[in-house]
Amino acid sequence: MIKGAIVLLLACLVLTVAGCGKEEAKTIKIGVIGPMSYIMGEHHWFGAQLAAEEINKAGGIKVGNDTYQIELVQVDSNELFSVTDAQSAAERAITVEGVSFLMGGIRSEAVAAMQEIAMDNKVIFFGCGASDVALCTKVTQNYERYKYWFRVTPVNGTYLAGVGFQLLHMAAQEIRSELGIMQPKVAILAEKNVFGDTMVAAANAQIPKMGMTVVGVWQPSPNATDLTAELSAIEAAGAHIIFTALSGPAGIPYAAKWGELQVPAASVGINVQAQDDGFWTATGGKGNYEMTMNIYARDVEITTKTKPFVDAFIAEKGVVPTYNAGTYDTVYILKGAIERAGSLDSDAVVVELEKTDYVGTPGKIVFDQTHDVKWGPGFVTAIGVQWQDGKLVGVWPPADGSWKTVVYKGIVDYKLPPWVIAKWKP
């Protein structure tokens, strides 16, 4: 009996010694939330994943005298179809999965609901997809509650509309110079939600001031699968340009049918689906000449970090990142704030996030007093991209520097669809 006890004691001692020096690595849990079955959520995840891999490989995040590895938690929000599902997903991420930080989101209504959950729990939440201005104005209206919210991407709806109007102006100038149509007719096609409604209001107010005529407004569901009726009506209205505001899956059937029918109107604006390489295959090549606002394009260099990131993303995932992959910069911004704070305490990290002055992949990222990302020359501007014969290329800001003297290497000329030229050329 004594012999058995000695053996057991020795076995325990061996196990104890074997365990020495193998302290479990400390981790920081970051929840990445979005519609994971769609490119928006996929790119939220891919962007964060790439940053986390780079940071962990380089040693992790230094917090005081401790070093932490990043642990990402993928959270499917299903927000394109259900705000309630999105809210529940955010709550599970925080209360069940135990994430310390949250980033992602795409649909403004859903992000607003998720924002409330994060604020209830004093969890820092980085917006990486929703553009509604109201998400950030809450910060100044009730700072103590909403100070944990920051938007990294995209720029807000006001600036999005401004960039969209620059793309519209570019197409209109081509129509004026090449086709001799001095007052182009514009059809507004925007999905029916907060984002779409905001864009419609802005477009109705701005387009006439740009020397163009609005011939109608069409607002399909963001999840529409057939836009034949809308496109037929737009053609019947005699539109020369379709100004789009599409963040949801409807962007694929829209562009495919536009190209198939060869609707004689240039398509410009925002079509998130067209920001992804899979768009070409998904539309069977019929999305050729579609133009959309984006953040990234092959061979376009906004900062010294842009091309290395895009190239790495393509090498890893096989596609060009959409703006939702701004989670990549977000993880690095969070790392910097945590290390400057020397703490994981949310209030301490917020103080450092407010000081952010970070040259990232889309430009210099600085937050204003509403915790919104600053837009304009010297900061984040976004770019215009167009599908040209199977390649997604950058076309705005123009290569001649005519927009506020901003020039990015790799920009090429915008092209009108040949069927538009054939229809309207005198």
List the predicted regions and their residue ranges.
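Extracytoplasmic ligand/sensor domains, especially the bilobed periplasmic-binding protein
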Residues: 99-215, 266-292
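Immediate post-signal peptide segment of exported/extracytoplasmic ligand-binding proteins
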Residues: 20-32, 62-71, 175-184
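Segments of small-molecule ligand-sensing domains
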Residues: 312-324, 335-402, 426
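Short, low-complexity disordered leader/linker segments with a strong preference
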Residues: 1-29, 94, 419-426
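Short, polar/charged alpha-helical segment
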Residues: 41-63, 201-209
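Extracellular/periplasmic periplasmic-binding protein-like sensory domains
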Residues: 132, 136, 154, 258-328, ...
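Beta-alpha junction/loop-to-helix N-cap segments that form part of ligand/metal-binding clefts
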Residues: 22-25, 40-46, 61-140, 152, ...
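Extracytoplasmic "Venus flytrap"
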Residues: 31-49, 75-83, 106-109, 189-198, ...
